[in-house]
From Swiss-Prot:
One of its GO terms (biological process) is leucyl-tRNA aminoacylation. This is Leucine--tRNA ligase. A motif ('KMSKS' region) lies at residues 618-622. Its main location: cytoplasm. ATP binds at residue 621. GO terms for molecular function: aminoacyl-tRNA deacylase activity; ATP binding; leucine-tRNA ligase activity. A motif ('HIGH' region) lies at residues 42-52. GO terms for cellular component: cytosol.
Length: 859
């Protein structure tokens, strides 16, 4: 065995072995329990970052652990390779998105292999290949045939100068990123999938996701946003028109003092014809992008329309205002405003001098709405026939009256909106729909799929090449001239079903149901919590679509979800001569000074610039504080990087990158190597004989088996990889102090090392593979079994009892493990130190905590 640990040499040899032997390639095996472990696949941006490394290390640890449990483990990888960054890079690098993407895939694939991740590369997929998106297109046509796909106009960001649609990321301070022209909102036809048809099931089935974090489940519940309320009809004074409003608080209906409608509401458009101020306000609202998130913080503004709504119960007229906080695409585009009991309505009413009336008060007191709205539920008053009713009774009484008079209906609403899947970009899967000469829109026939995206294109940075090339859209369907759809799919489409394609990546159909149903659902899914409401909801939705198409037989795509925390690093900058911040990589910081608590107080970079330290923040390009994993692997080895990633923090919390911690991980592996080397060179041939062990030997062996039990639980159930590593480190400390003089001493060390290399194999697989062979095992570690706890070894022959006299420790005594109180008390009382401290005192009380403590009270 080599005396020195040489990671680059070991890792290259072990990785070659895995590659040559196709170690991680798997097939379906009905006789073995399966385990499908999946980390969210990466976008091929060019290089892996530490966030990737953390995600994929966690996945690999879980997969390798399950393999040693004897399971048939699938751990695939692929590339989420469509998307806007490729278009931007292609423009900047004067190339096309395809070659840039494929080059990045090759580079990053090599990086993943250098980190030793045990992927089944035979199942690798790239979503930008026709072999993949063909089936996505096919499935979309099937959804269309089932009535789950439709087209309607929706608002997009429009650059009037370039005459092109902009993604949200391409709008900077309200202007086009390329030409700085103010961006407008434009209504264009787009394709939607009816996720709302599954809203109730998506919501209810959250309760079945026992292995998902509560935070993610709560976020999805809120995103789906089920509410029970009443949709009621308001008339318009002096007109034969009416409009609907939905509310979850019909108990406050008697306090309505005005109605707010969206700028795009038909009533606003009518009123604007004779109201120039309103017309200008509507135009302004149309050209401002307003997300729901922005609504909460932006200034609330409005203009009176001059129209009045008729209260559905009292018949009273209340003014109708057009307001910038009401969205036409959310609800009915109109809200009843009760400023006495809604803070937003209150502030708007105060601003514009509108009436504020209280109709709800606390059960046990009066209500004061002079400074703010009273938003709690309570008892109705100033509400005519409904006075004195509580929330529930008031809700029901008012709802029943509206229903009886034909002016309303009870309704369950969802915040969730249908999924708009059209993107006016080039680098995405073409949407497989065509328009015939007579204007009829139909799906592309199956025998004409895939609709190929041309890859040999020139990007001008303005228009999608398939929109600019008028010939591309021309096609024929059933002998008729037709025009292809030139929009492409939202890239969330590809990531919504990739997990299922891995089960049969080469099938000449979307999925091979037999293979899909063997592997699915995913047993462990790993990815960032930032995907909670988009990807993870679409992922669940698509699984239900696949189920209803007869392709899978489970209801949910993943049993367990682990959301790993971000990776943070120190961030430094200096101010240059132009007064701008220049962010400096932590690797370029030459010297630092720290206070007595270890906090950085001064830093200087390699060029002598004095730096401002801003603390730990998420690794990012903008702060130049990303650490290249490849640099760390070349310096310390993949196993060290993996070990640090697992040890530095619990997986769901943020991880603070500290190179001193990486060095510590490296030292630990060298200690393990040294201990194994010493053991191998001692050539011990004596087999372990537990019947001959001394009490010290039994105690050491007990530590070995306690560690096996803890690590098994920490990795397998708790997923606390950091405490698993800490337990092995503690065991190593015991082993390094242990004597190796007798054959049984060495036999225990041998048993311990055999356990340790398997316990650490999921985390540091290269060194574990090597040491397993050096320890004399005939088969490779991948074919071994996870170490099993010897329950007999955990049984203690004796216990160390702490003896206190009047609350102070005066002695420690060793007693038989099964000793009763009387014998422990007798031993304690006869200890020379205890006798000394009891001299001249009378024992008043003796308390025995079995196996731990003997407490004597005397005076």
């Amino acid at each position: 065995m080599q005396e020195q640990y040489n990671p680059s040499e070991i890792e290259a040899l072990v990785q070659k072995h895995w590659h040559d032997n196709k170690t991680f390639e798997v097939t379906e095996d009905a006789n073995k329990e399966k385990f499908y472990c999946l980390s969210m696949f990466p976008y091929p941006s060019g290089r892996l970052h530490m966030g990737h490394v953390r995600n994929y290390t966690i996945g690999d640890v879980v997969a390798r652990f399950q393999r040693l449990q004897g399971k048939n483990v699938l751990q695939p990888i692929g590339w989420d390779s469509f998307g806007l960054p490729a278009e931007n890079a292609a423009i900047n690098n004067k190339t096309a998105p395809a070659p840039w993407t494929y080059e990045n895939i090759e580079y990053m694939k090599n990086q993943l292999k250098l980190l030793g991740f045990g992927y089944d590369w035979s199942r690798e997929i790239a979503t930008c290949t026709p072999e993949y998106y063909r089936w996505e297109q096919w499935f979309f046509t099937k959804l269309y045939e089932k009535g789950l796909v439709y087209k309607k106009t929706a608002s997009v960001n429009w650059c009037p100068n370039d005459e092109t649609v902009l993604a949200n990321e391409q709008v900077q301070d309200g202007c086009c990123w390329r030409c700085d022209t103010p961006v407008e909102q434009k209504e264009i036809p787009q394709w939607f999938i009816k996720i709302t048809a599954y809203a109730e099931e998506l919501l209810n089935d959250i309760d079945t996701l026992d292995g998902w974090p509560e935070q993610v489940k709560t976020m999805q519940r809120n995103w789906i946003g089920r509410s029970e309320g009443v949709e009621m009809t308001f008339g318009v004074a002096g007109h034969d028109k009416s409009f609907d409003i939905y509310t979850t608080r019909p108990d406050t209906l008697m306090g309505v003092t005005y109605v707010a409608i969206a700028a795009g509401h038909p009533l606003a458009e009518i009123a604007a014809q004779t109201n120039p101020e309103l017309a200008a306000f509507i135009d302004e609202c149309k050209n401002s992008t307003t997300s729901e998130a922005e609504l909460a913080t932006m200034e609330k503004r409005g203009v009176a329309t001059g129209l009045f709504a008729i209260h559905p119960i009292t018949g009273k007229q209340v003014p109708i205002w057009a307001a910038n906080f009401v969205l036409m695409n959310y609800g009915t585009g109109a809200v009843m405003s009760v400023p006495g009991h809604d803070q937003r309505d209150f502030e708007f009413a105060k601003k514009y001098g509108l009436a504020i009336e209280a109709v709800i008060k606390p059960v046990d007191g009066d209500v004061d709405i002079s400074e703010a709205a009273y938003t709690e539920k309570g008892v109705l008053f100033n509400s005519g026939e409904f006075d004195g009713l509580d929330f529930e009774a008031g809700f029901n009484a008012i709802a029943n009256k509206l229903v009886a008079e034909g002016k309303g209906k009870r309704q369950v609403n969802y915040r969730l909106r249908d999924w708009g899947v059209s993107r006016q970009r080039y680098w995405g899967a073409p949407i497989p729909m065509v328009t015939l000469a007579d204007g009829t829109v139909i799906p592309t026939p199956a025998d004409q799929l895939p609709v190929l995206l041309p890859e040999d294109v020139v990007m001008d940075g303005i228009q999608s090449p398939i929109k600019a090339d008028k010939e591309w859209a021309k096609t024929q369907v059933n002998g008729q001239d037709a025009l292809r759809e030139t929009d492409t799919f939202d890239t969330f489409m590809e990531s919504s079903w990739y997990y299922a394609r891995y089960c049969s990546p080469h099938a000449d159909e979307m999925l091979d149901p037999a293979k899909a149903n063997y592997w699915l659902p995913v047993d462990q899914y790993i990815g960032g919590i930032e995907h909670a409401c988009m990807h993870l909801l679409y992922f669940r939705f698509f699984h239900k679509l696949l189920r209803d198409a007869g392709l899978v037989n489970s209801n949910e795509p993943a049993k367990q979800l682990l959301t790993q925390g971000m990776v943070l690093a120190d961030a430094f900058y200096y101010i240059n001569e132009k007064g701008a911040r220049v962010w400096v990589s932590p690797l370029d910081v030459a010297t630092t000074e720290k206070d007595d608590k270890g906090r950085i107080t001064k830093a200087i970079d390699k060029d002598g610039n004095e730096l401002v330290y801003t603390g730990m923040s998420k690794m990012s390009k903008s702060k130049n504080n990303g650490i290249d994993p490849q640099v760390m692997v070349e310096k310390y080895g993949a196993d060290t990087v993996r070990l640090f990633m697992m040890f530095a923090s619990p997986p769901e919390l943020t991880l603070e990158w500290q190179e001193s911690g990486v060095e510590g991980a490296h030292r630990f592996i060298k200690r393990l190597w040294k201990l194994a080397n010493e053991h191998v060179n001692q050539a011990n041939s004596e087999a372990l004989d537990v019947s001959t062990l001394t009490s010290d030997q039994k105690a050491l062996r007990r530590e070995v088996h306690k560690t096996i039990a803890k690590v098994t639980d920490d990795i397998g159930r708790r997923q606390m990889f950091n405490t698993a590593v800490a337990a092995v480190m503690e065991l190593m400390n015991h082993l390094q102090k242990a004597p190796q003089t007798t054959g049984q001493d060495r036999a225990i060390i041998g048993e311990a090392l055999s356990a340790i290399v398997r316990l650490l194999y999921p985390i540091i697989p290269h060194v574990s593979f090597n040491l397993w062979n050096e320890l004399g095992n005939a088969s490779n570690i991948e074919d071994s079994q996870w170490p099993v706890v010897d329950e007999a070894a955990l049984v203690e022959d004796s216990k160390l009892i702490v003896v206190q006299v009047n609350g102070k420790v005066r002695a420690k005594i060793t007693v038989a493990a099964d000793a009763d109180k009387e014998s422990v008390e007798a031993l304690g009382m006869s200890d020379e130190h205890v006798i000394k401290y009891l001299d001249g005192l009378t024992v008043r009380k003796v308390i025995y905590v079995p196996g731990k403590l003997l407490s004597i009270v005397a005076n």
